[in-house]
């Protein structure tokens, strides 16, 4: 039994005495303790060494007092498992070779055995679950098919998603074939993460806003639905968060994907999102990550604003406090600590 299950209860829109908080990229470069581990090895080796991945997963629980841990990994491990060569240089960016741009390229991608190709993530989850000793829940995650598709087709990050869009508009059948292949891998991977001990799942569609509303409904959302359905078919009790960054104009469609919670970027008032979705799902977010560059007073006032905008809870509301995207690497850890402590204290009056 979890000693602190506030995060899980909030995702399920059950009553909680206060609002739980965790932060995307909470295991990361802003922490000197993370940097000390990271200095010994490269980024992907850190992801692939269960003992080290476990250590950095737990750091923010010990140091910051967050209400959930998220397994330390990277969304691109899925691309690598499917046969792509992935290079991640934290300060310089990402390179995937060869880029997937033809039918022959798609045919070469493998349908991986998750235990074999991504066993290191599952081992890290098992280890972290054991080390956490039920203090807080552990989140497993994957990138969404659309986001992983953009990396595969572009061969890295992109401003305009030229190659990805070319395939979408010129060869939509081929695009869907690749998306489906990626989605099948994601579904299997997420189910395996729960099997290994993950208490909740988040699907990150980081590049969601590269698509128009209609294109998002066609090329992204159906695959998120598949991934959520796969988790729910195997583990109906496991809550799932869908984070389609900055797709604020179609929140209702995203809320219909079957996920328990919808993650919000910071460029929407959470009150608007709550009103539109009418407490059909839990909301996660959504303070601007750059607020953590501010003074303690400013951090508290901005956090108070998010809590106030969400407003008073009722019998079927849920809110998980988070940033609208990942914490930035040059933030002072004391500022995150300040945020976590403030949210824990301030949020009680809304419950």
From Swiss-Prot:
Enumerate the GO terms in the molecular function aspect: uroporphyrinogen decarboxylase activity
Task: Return the annotated site residues (Transition state stabilizer).
Answer: 74
Q: Gene3D superfamilies, from UniProt? A: 3.20.20.210
Q: Name one Pfam family in it.
A: URO-D
Enzyme Commission (EC) number:
4.1.1.37
Q: Which UniProt keywords apply?
A: Cytoplasm, Decarboxylase, Lyase, Porphyrin biosynthesis
One GO cellular component term: cytosol
Reactions mediated catalytically: uroporphyrinogen III + 4 H(+) = coproporphyrinogen III + 4 CO2
Give the chief site where it resides. cytoplasm
- SUPFAM superfamilies attached to this UniProt entry: UROD/MetE-like
Locate the residues binding substrate.
25-29, 43, 74, 151, 206, 325
**What name does this protein carry?**
Uroporphyrinogen decarboxylase
Organism per entry: Chlorobaculum tepidum (strain ATCC 49652 / DSM 12025 / NBRC 103806 / TLS) (Chlorobium tepidum)
């Amino acid at each position: 039994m979890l000693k602190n299950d506030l995060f899980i209860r909030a995702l399920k829109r059950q009553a909680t005495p206060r609002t739980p908080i965790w932060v995307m990229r909470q295991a990361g470069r802003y922490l000197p303790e993370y940097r000390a581990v990271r200095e010994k090895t490269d980024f992907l080796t850190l992801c692939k060494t269960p003992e080290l991945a476990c250590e950095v997963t737990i750091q923010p629980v010990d140091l910051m007092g967050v209400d959930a841990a998220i397994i330390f990994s990277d969304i691109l491990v899925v691309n690598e498992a499917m046969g792509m060569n992935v290079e991640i240089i934290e300060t310089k960016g990402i390179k995937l070779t060869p880029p997937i741009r033809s039918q022959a390229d798609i045919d070469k991608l493998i349908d991986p055995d998750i235990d074999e190709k991504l066993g290191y993530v599952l081992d890290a989850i098992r280890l972290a679950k054991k080390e956490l000793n039920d203090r807080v829940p552990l989140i497993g995650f994957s990138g969404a098919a659309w986001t992983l598709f953009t990396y595969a087709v572009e061969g890295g990050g992109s401003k305009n998603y030229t190659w990805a869009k070319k395939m979408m508009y010129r060869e939509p059948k081929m695009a869907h074939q690749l998306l489906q292949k990626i989605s099948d891998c994601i579904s299997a991977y997420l189910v395996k993460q729960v099997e290994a001990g993950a208490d909740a799942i988040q699907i990150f569609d980081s590049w969601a806003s590269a698509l128009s509303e209609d294109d998002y409904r066609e090329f992204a959302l159906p695959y998120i639905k598949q991934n959520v359905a796969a988790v729910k078919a195997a583990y109906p009790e496991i809550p799932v968060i869908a984070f389609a960054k900055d797709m604020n104009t179609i929140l209702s469609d995203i809320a219909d994907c079957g996920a328990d919670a919808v993650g919000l970027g910071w460029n929407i008032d959470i009150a608007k999102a709550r009103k539109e979705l009418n407490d059909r799902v839990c909301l996660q977010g959504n303070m601007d990550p750059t607020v953590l560059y501010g003074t303690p007073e400013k951090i508290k006032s901005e956090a108070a604003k998010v809590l106030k905008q969400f407003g008073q809870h009722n019998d079927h509301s849920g809110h998980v406090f988070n940033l609208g995207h990942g914490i930035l690497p040059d933030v002072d850890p004391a500022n995150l600590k300040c945020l976590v402590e403030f949210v824990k204290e301030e949020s009680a009056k809304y419950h």
